């Protein structure tokens, strides 16, 4: 049989979500079964050709006239389609989806295919020829009739219209694959299983198309009516429900891999147990929508055996009516093939039931064989090769629904957990809640708004699982911008629904919307009706939203009024000495507010801190639904420690955040995600477990206080007294009426009754003893008096119950998300292998949660059952209930271990306190108590905070955080600005400017900074003083050195003078002696001459004597002077000595020789008469000497001055030389720097060349150092330069100080230049 070459054209479907879906079919290889069938078909074709040769020439002419060229048929189809309004919508959608280039390519392909099809024979003509030949066959030939019946079932085409587009698709009954015959032929006695059918050459896209055709889409309007909701408001997923079967068949396969996580042992060899088949179970009914026109009721069996070829006496008219109905449907949809096909089909069916009785028996057998496989499907490719594979998959799906799905239903109803609940417009996928979930009225309203359509389960495959958001990182430092976002995130708030599954990105949404589907398509009128209905729904939803907003605004106004009232009352009561809120109106309002809002969703101004010793209850639990009046009495006693006005500002800021969150409930939020370490996750798990344990104990103890029998001990004592009096009266009656038998009988009865009363009294005594024991054990927690306001007490119980319900629900969601991640998001081989034996083990895995203590939380439903069975609570029942959780609860947190009327803070609670201080500061204790400590009061938190910060406490994390947290520059600037405005008022500064810093911490930082400044100033002053002292010392040392030099010079001069004087004295003495000798000689000579002249007659002896005497006189002055002469001589001698002593010596530094300038008195030799020198002459000589001496003194002073001037000149010259040397050194340094800069520039140029060799743009070499840059740093550099518009050294310094502290300014500058070069290169490359 010739095949038709056809291009993969997109089939478009507009689903109820207004999302287009298209896919392409791929060619498929042939299996050995298909080859056998092809051989059979070829044999049939040969027989048909032989029959055609036997036909009459008249029929051949008629058939040739009826034949039309394929081009004409295609043109007729296109004209009809273009005239239809649906085709226009189809073209618009294609233009929106397919780009123009692809459209042109598709048109070219279609034109090429038309040319190919013009050469090929037409299928319709072949069909007509075959049908005409069948009319002439012998009615008695059984084999030919059997073949004709098969061909009639194979070739009959039924056309249907699309749901929303104008494109048409043909539903062809494929070649049936009789799997039972195939199994029997291989001699294997078994049911249909995947192991005995070859799945290699199957087309999975056709399988998906088969699922889509047999499973109808449920519109949104009727989803609520069709869903079978349980008492919790969720869909019931029974395994035998049709909707659930549709849900299973809608699980898509795509490009997924193995889901076999745990074991893959017996996947191929598994054979399900045999069971009796019911005809009703094989039927796959198709849902007929109001707006969708289906062709006929397509079922797994067309009719029962009674109506289909079972008896001989079927009338041809009935069969013709049946066939005419199908043909009429065909005539409505396709006009060009209606005439030929109707006649031929009628001829085939008229001849199909003619035969003998043996033929009927054979037909019955064939019907039995074909019952399980006669399932129609949509053939998108119109290829005969894929017919067999589709029947194989249909058989496998039926086998799964009959066998394997029943076994899965017995596994604790796991599929009851697979209910899904999508958000608004299916943008956000939200995990479902379990069936055993305890829900409030608010939660039920939210969950019933949106119910999952069956097809839209596909959207989950594109969602992204995200780890839960942690509360805070321990190194987290909040900013003013982040606080608003963080205040909206709560540990127990509504936004935890978004922690587990987030919305997929746009690309994934588009991919999910473009999944292959081939559902039946409706007419254009149905699409318009759907659009109108959607518009009406949108309008209704908008009206509802507006009404909700109005109601929220009204509630806000009421809250503000209440707040103003409470503030006014607070001011009034503050003036009183015995302060305290004791008004009844506030307690009434608190009870009203508790009904409107949940425990954790209530506003902060309505919440309050109840005390364990207060009037509300005897348990240390706080109900946040109550107003501030419950704990305000404690605030007045402790107002010295904590100021109350700090709480007002915090409440206002958090009100705004809550209002914003209420307005944006339905919007998709993008919460910031923080990564968690394993240690942090374990800490969170411990905190949740402790919180859960404390809540259960609080809940049970508060229930005990609702039973008045646990408190009325006095009534039981009165009953004891009455019973004792009755017993005494009965003994008296016995004594008085002992004679009468009747009286004795009555007395015996009375005694029996009295004995019963005594037993009861003994039991009451035992009960009282037990109650007293319980009160002794729980004396620090439970008061003996019942609560005064039972309404308020019941409200607190409800709030604690809500918290437990929320915790359980979050745990269930967390577990379900882990299950979905293993089932849905893992790869699957094919839809037939979705639930194999190994997968069934993975469907209900033992989930180990990292965030929850699952073993303890799973017991919560049993707690609810026990509470229902215990309407009259007591201490015994409480201990019985707590014994269930004994293995999972820690003894350190049991109430029996509590002492001194308060619970000790655990390590986990200390961590929660640290998280609260980081997030809300040290003034918002009430907010911290609401968010983190429902079982504590704000006063307890404040005292714990102070105890942890005290000097006596050990080192802890809170102390490390507050003492070790460094101030940033921004915080310092804020603090300086606040000090200028408010001074040293640390409370105001920490409240208004730096609320995450404690006042004591601010004070300590300020004092420490000022001390450091003072130390710096002192150090600078001391340095100045030291410098001054050093200068003075140096000056004094120089003066002393100069004085010492002068003294040394003076001493040297004195020594020289002494030596010179000593030499002068010796010379003078020698000269004087010589003069005297000369004088004596002269005198002797004169005397001798005179004597010779006078006495010529003297003897020679006298001469000798005279001569001897003269010679002797040279040594001895034997000359005798007179008185006057001696005096004059003595004076001369004294003068000479004085002159000699004072005779100066002038030394020149240039020469070592000494010059002596003396002016001694020269006494000319004269006779004795000349010795009589007058005093006047002597005085003149003395005056001359003095003048000479004065001149010498002046010369000496001039010499000293010259020497001093020379020293100064030398010093100046030395200073000038030093200055010159310094200048030379500076010049040398400058030259060196210039030389180094030149070298650096050369290195940079070389480095740039090396960088191009390295081909890495994020590396830079500066001063021989390789530096790595990130994109964020480059972005910061470019943005700052762009904002400031200039390039200065100040910019680089500011960047290195603030934003890029790891780099120097020079490195940043060179990186900027490098970036400019890279940008230029990229632009040049583009050009």
Swiss-Prot record:
Residues 131-153, 263-390, 504-668, 717-770, 1061-1122, 1144-1168 are annotated as: Disordered. Residues 131-142, 322-353, 511-532, 646-668, 722-732, 1061-1118, 1144-1160 have a biased composition (Low complexity). Residues 533-542, 555-577 have a biased composition (Basic residues). Residues 959-1010, 1268-1316 form the Myb-like domain. Gene3D superfamilies: Homeodomain-like. Residues 607-619 have a biased composition (Gly residues). One of its GO terms (cellular component) is nucleus. This is Myb-like protein O. The keyword DNA-binding applies. Transmembrane segments: none annotated. Disulfide bonds: none annotated. GO terms for biological process: regulation of DNA-templated transcription. Residues 543-554 have a biased composition (Basic and acidic residues). It holds the Pfam family Myb_DNA-binding_7. InterPro entries: Homeodomain-like_sf, Myb_dom, SANT/Myb, YY1-Transcr_Regul. Residues 925-949 bind DNA.
């Amino acid at each position: 049989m010739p095949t038709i070459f056809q291009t993969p054209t997109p089939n478009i479907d507009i689903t109820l979500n207004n999302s287009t879906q298209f896919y392409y079919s791929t060619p498929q290889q042939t299996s050995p079964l298909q080859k056998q069938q092809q051989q059979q078909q070829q044999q049939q074709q040969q027989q048909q050709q032989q029959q055609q040769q036997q036909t009459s020439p008249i029929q051949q002419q008629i058939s040739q006239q009826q034949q039309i060229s394929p081009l004409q048929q295609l043109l007729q189809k296109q004209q009809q389609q273009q005239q239809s309004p649906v085709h226009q919508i189809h073209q618009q959608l294609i233009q929106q989806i397919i780009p123009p280039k692809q459209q042109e390519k598709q048109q070219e392909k279609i034109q090429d295919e038309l040319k190919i099809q013009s050469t090929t024979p037409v299928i319709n003509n072949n069909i007509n020829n075959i049908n005409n030949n069948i009319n002439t066959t012998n009615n008695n030939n059984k084999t030919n009739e059997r073949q004709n019946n098969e061909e009639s079932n194979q070739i009959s085409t039924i056309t249907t219209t699309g749901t929303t587009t104008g494109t048409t698709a043909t539903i062809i009954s494929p070649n049936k694959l009789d799997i039972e015959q195939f199994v029997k032929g291989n001699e294997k006695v078994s049911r249909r299983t995947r192991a005995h059918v070859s799945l290699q050459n199957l087309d999975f896209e056709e399988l998906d198309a088969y699922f889509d055709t047999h499973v109808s889409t449920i519109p949104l309007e009727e989803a609520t009516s069709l869903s079978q909701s349980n008492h919790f408001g969720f869909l019931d997923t029974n395994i035998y429900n049709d909707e659930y079967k549709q849900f299973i068949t809608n699980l898509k396969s795509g490009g997924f891999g193995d889901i076999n996580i745990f074991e893959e042992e017996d996947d191929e060899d598994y054979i399900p147990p045999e069971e009796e088949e019911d005809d009703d179970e094989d039927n796959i009914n198709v849902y007929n929508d109001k707006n969708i026109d289906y062709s006929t009721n397509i079922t797994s069996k067309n009719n029962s055996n009674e109506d289909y070829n079972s008896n001989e006496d079927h009338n041809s008219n009935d069969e013709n009516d049946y066939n005419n109905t199908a043909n009429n449907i065909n005539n409505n949809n396709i006009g060009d093939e209606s005439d030929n096909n109707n006649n031929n089909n009628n001829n085939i069916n008229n001849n199909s039931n003619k035969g003998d009785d043996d033929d009927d028996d054979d037909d019955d057998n064939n019907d039995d064989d074909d019952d399980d496989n006669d399932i129609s499907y949509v053939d998108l490719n119109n290829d005969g090769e894929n017919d067999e594979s589709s029947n194989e998959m249909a058989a496998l799906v039926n086998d799964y629904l009959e066998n394997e799905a029943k076994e899965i239903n017995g596994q604790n109803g796991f599929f009851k957990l697979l209910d899904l609940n999508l958000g608004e417009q299916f943008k956000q996928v939200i995990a479902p809640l379990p069936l055993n979930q305890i829900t409030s009225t608010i939660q039920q309203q939210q969950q019933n708004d949106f119910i999952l359509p069956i097809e839209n389960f596909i959207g989950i495959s594109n969602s992204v699982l995200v780890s839960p958001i942690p509360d805070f990182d321990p190194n987290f430092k909040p900013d003013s911008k982040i606080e608003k976002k963080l205040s909206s995130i709560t540990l127990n708030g509504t936004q935890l629904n978004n922690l587990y599954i987030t919305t997929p990105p746009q690309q994934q949404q588009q991919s999910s919307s473009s999944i292959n589907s081939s559902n039946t398509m409706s007419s254009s009128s149905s699409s318009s009706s759907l659009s109108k209905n959607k518009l009406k729904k949108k309008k209704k939803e908008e009206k509802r939203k507006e009404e909700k907003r109005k109601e929220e605004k009204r509630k806000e106004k009421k809250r503000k009024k209440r707040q103003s009232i409470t503030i006014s009352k607070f001011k009034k009561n503050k003036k009183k000495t015995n302060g305290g809120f004791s008004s009844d109106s506030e307690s009434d309002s608190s009870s009203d507010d508790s009904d409107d809002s949940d425990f954790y969703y209530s506003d902060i101004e309505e919440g309050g801190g109840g005390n364990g010793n207060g009037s509300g209850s005897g348990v240390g639990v706080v109900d946040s639904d109550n107003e501030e009046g419950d704990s305000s009495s404690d605030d007045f006693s402790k107002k010295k420690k904590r100021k109350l006005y700090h709480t007002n500002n915090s409440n206002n800021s958090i009100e705004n955040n809550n209002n914003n969150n209420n307005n944006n409930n339905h919007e998709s939020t993008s919460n910031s995600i923080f990564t968690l370490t394993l240690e942090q996750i374990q800490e969170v798990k411990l905190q949740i477990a402790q919180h859960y344990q404390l809540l259960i104990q609080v809940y049970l103890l508060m229930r005990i206080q609702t039973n008045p029998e646990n408190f009325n001990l006095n009534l039981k004592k009165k009953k004891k007294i009455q019973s004792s009096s009755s017993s005494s009266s009965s003994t008296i009656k016995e004594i008085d009426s002992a004679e009468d038998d009747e009286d004795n009988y009555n007395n015996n009865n009375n005694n029996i009754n009295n004995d019963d009363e005594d037993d009861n009294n003994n039991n009451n005594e035992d009960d009282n003893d037990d109650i007293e024991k319980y009160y002794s054990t729980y004396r620090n927690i439970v008061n003996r008096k019942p609560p005064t306001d039972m309404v308020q007490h019941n409200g607190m119980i409800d709030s604690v119950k809500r918290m437990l319900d929320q915790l359980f629900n979050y745990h269930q969601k967390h577990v379900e998300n882990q299950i979905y991640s293993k089932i849905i998001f893992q790869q699957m081989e094919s839809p037939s292998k979705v639930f194999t034996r190994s997968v069934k083990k993975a469907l209900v895995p033992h989930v180990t949660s990292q965030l929850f203590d699952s073993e303890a939380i799973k017991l919560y439903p049993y707690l609810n059952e026990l509470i229902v069975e215990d309407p009259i609570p007591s201490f015994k029942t409480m201990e019985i209930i707590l014994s269930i959780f004994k293995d999972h609860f820690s003894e350190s947190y049991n109430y029996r271990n509590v002492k001194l009327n308060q619970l000790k803070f655990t390590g986990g609670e200390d961590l929660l306190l640290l998280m609260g201080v980081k997030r809300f500061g040290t003034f918002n204790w009430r907010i911290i108590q609401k968010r983190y400590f429902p079982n504590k009061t704000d006063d307890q938190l404040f005292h714990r905070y102070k105890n942890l910060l005290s000097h006596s406490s050990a080192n802890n994390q809170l102390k490390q955080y507050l003492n070790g947290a460094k101030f940033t520059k921004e915080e310092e600037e804020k603090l300086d600005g606040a000090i200028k405005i408010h001074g040293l008022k640390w409370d105001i500064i920490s409240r208004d400017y730096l609320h995450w810093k404690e006042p004591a911490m601010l004070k300590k930082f300020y004092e420490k900074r000022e001390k450091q400044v003072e130390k710096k100033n002192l150090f600078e002053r001391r340095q100045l003083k030291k410098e001054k002292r050093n200068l003075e010392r140096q000056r004094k040392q120089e003066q002393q050195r100069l004085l010492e030099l002068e003294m040394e010079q003076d001493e040297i001069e004195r020594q020289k003078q002494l030596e010179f004087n000593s030499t002068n004295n010796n010379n003078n003495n020698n000269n004087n002696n010589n003069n005297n000798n000369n004088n004596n000689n002269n005198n002797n000579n004169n005397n001798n001459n005179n004597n010779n002249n006078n006495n010529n007659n003297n003897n020679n002896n006298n001469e000798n004597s005279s001569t001897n005497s003269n010679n002797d006189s040279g040594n001895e002055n034997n000359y005798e002077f007179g008185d006057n002469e001696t005096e004059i001589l003595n004076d001369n001698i004294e003068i000479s000595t004085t002159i000699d002593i004072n005779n100066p010596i002038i030394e020149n530094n240039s020469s070592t020789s000494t010059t002596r300038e003396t002016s001694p008195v020269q006494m000319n030799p004269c006779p004795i008469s000349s010795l009589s020198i007058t005093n006047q002459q002597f005085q003149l000589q003395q005056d001359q000497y003095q003048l000479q001496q004065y001149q010498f003194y002046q010369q000496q002073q001039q010499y000293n001055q010259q020497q001093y001037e020379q020293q100064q000149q030398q010093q100046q010259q030395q200073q000038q030389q030093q200055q010159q040397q310094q200048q030379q050194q500076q010049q040398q340094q400058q030259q060196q720097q210039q030389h180094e800069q030149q070298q650096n520039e050369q290195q940079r140029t070389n480095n740039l060349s090396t960088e191009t060799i390295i081909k890495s743009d994020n590396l830079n070499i500066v001063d021989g150092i390789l530096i790595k840059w990130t994109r964020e740093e480059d972005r910061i550099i470019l943005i700052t330069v762009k904002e400031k518009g200039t390039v200065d050294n100040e910019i680089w310094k500011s960047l290195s100080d603030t934003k890029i502290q790891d780099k120097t300014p020079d490195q940043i500058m060179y990186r900027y230049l490098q970036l400019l070069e890279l940008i230029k290169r990229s632009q040049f490359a583009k050009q």
